[in-house]
Amino acid sequence: MFNTPTPDSENTYDAILVGAGIMSSTLAVLLHELEPDLRLLVVEKLSSAGLESSCAKNNAGTGHAANCELNYTPIQEDGHLSTNKAFEINKSFEQSLEFWASLAEKGKLIPKTFLNKLPHISLVFGDEDISLLKKRFSKLSSHAAFAEMEFTMDHGELKDWVPLIMDGRQHSEKIAATRIKRGTDIDFGNLTRSYINQIEGAKSIDINYSTNVENLQQDSEGDWYLSLEGAKNNRIVRSKFVFLGAGGGALSLLQKSRIPEGLLYAGFPVSGKWLICDEEKSTKTHNAKVYGKAAVGAPPMSVPHLDTRWIDKKKSLLFGPFAGFSSNFLKYGSKLDLFRSIKTTNLFSMLQAGLDNIDLGKYLLNQLIQTNEDRIDTLKRFLPQVSPNDWKLSTAGQRVQIIKQTSKGGVLKMGTEVVTSSDGSLAALLGASPGASTAVTIMIEVLNRCWLEKMKSSKWKNKMLELFPSIGTDINSDQEALLAIRKRNDFLLKLI
């Protein structure tokens, strides 16, 4: 234990949330809505909220609802197209909309500051991929969640959907697309700051910026002590509950916590790059989120997409992502992050995961040696008439892909994962996509795993029902409930 006096009441909290990104801010708002008197501390190493992975330019994609992302409907070894992930993510995103709608109804969120309605489109080329898209359309559109999905191979109709993409394209080219008009683009940086703005004036909440968590330890009675190093002062704080929502930085803090569950994990960082266009002639013409299909052998993170994005209220086009490599676990982290994370408990898992993912290694190597001309050539598959000078390369945020020790050895996992201590006193979020778009569902999982007794109480149950009118209902199997909650969400978020 730290050789310091026991923290006084001023330095004792009901919950300490590390990181002021979309995850911690979502959890902070949820806890404050459920019990306003809870003493919460949010600790952020940067100078403001939402500057790392939650920042709009650092996001690999937003508004993930499985409307257009083909990697959420993978083809199995037996040729079967699996839709389980698509329905799971669609339901999770609807829950995010439901939460935002409830806060908007209370006057605590202004939808137009972070949310824009935007069609979601899947676009493919050639007979084989068109056949796959038809199969996806057939399976998804037969269910209420995706009933509004449209399919076309008609060049005239496609020119109406995506005029910039169809400009200069040969009429003989085989191309197909699906579209769902009820899509969105989310500025998660602005949303994060909106969350923080609504709670930072509360007497029960402290937010410390430019403050780093140097270490954390648990005492014999289950309390956590965190050593904080700030720009203004250093201090020791205490809490019954800690959430590590520091993006790529969560892994190193999880390792410092020394909980047995954390020994199962390692991480592999992948940086991202975007081609960005701010030219009005292009941004006015393209108005959609358009996802293609990853090349054979390429990982899901490589799915190319051309997105209309509103970043700090300015409309831009982003194409990518292109992968890069940095040993940082955070964009504003240290080059030593990866090396410091290697322990005797996870080294074998990392080596095994590397051997089992040779294709990923080849993909990353090819990405690293790409020139800007190579990237523009990739963009030309989407935009035959592209003007290269209109597009600038920008570095996005860092992703730390999970490597987990399982009964089969070290496994590289592409999604997100909540890790909790056996006593529920600590939770950490690891991983990447779909991330921010499903933050609400992920944080409800944290509450159910770490605040179970409170979640069972009538007080919290009633509050949850107030925030989530559909809670307890499977909207994927109850069409009437799905349509009702979508009608409410669309009205309150002004998506109609």
UniProtKB/Swiss-Prot annotation:
It comes from the Bacteria. It catalyses: (S)-malate + a quinone = a quinol + oxaloacetate. Gene3D superfamilies: FAD/NAD(P)-binding domain. Keywords: FAD, Flavoprotein, Oxidoreductase, Tricarboxylic acid cycle. Its cofactor is FAD. Pathway: Carbohydrate metabolism; tricarboxylic acid cycle; oxaloacetate from (S)-malate (quinone route): step 1/1. Pfam families: Mqo (PF06039). GO terms for biological process: tricarboxylic acid cycle. Its EC number is 1.1.5.4. The keyword Flavoprotein applies. One of its GO terms (molecular function) is L-malate dehydrogenase (quinone) activity. InterPro entries: FAD/NAD-bd_sf (IPR036188), MQO (IPR006231). Belongs to the MQO family. This is Probable malate:quinone oxidoreductase. It comes from Prochlorococcus marinus (strain NATL1A). The gene is mqo.
